[in-house]
Amino acid sequence: MNLERYWAKPDKTIQQHINDLLTHLETLKTMGYIDSDDLYELVKLACYYHDIGKVTERFQQRVLAKEKQYFDPDREIPHNVLSVYFVNENQVQKIKGHDKRDYARVCFAVMYHHDYCDPIKTILEREDRIKENLAEV
């Protein structure tokens, strides 16, 4: 998926936003706050996946609208919930020294990077709407 084609914000693509986060991640590593290569790789994956749920047609229409449009809870699923469906478990498993819980850790970081909703409750109660939103991709 070419994330340069999708917008995270009106003035920034998802890929540009990811690149910004990765720059900050490098700063944290350089400063010694991330001293484990495994942790660095897990956070890097979380940075990559955290906003991919914004690729939906509804989000893209909203972010590019000339006049401010608000999130429609009847039609949309928060992007942090949708993003977790894109996390690739195989990528997590490729990390040297990975732990079987690492996939869940990355998913948790992605799901809870905003507090728009209770992600688990949303997943359990809005499965049909999640499928509709993901079908737009």
Place the predicted regions along the sequence by residue:
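Metal-dependent phosphohydrolase cores
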Residues: M1-V137
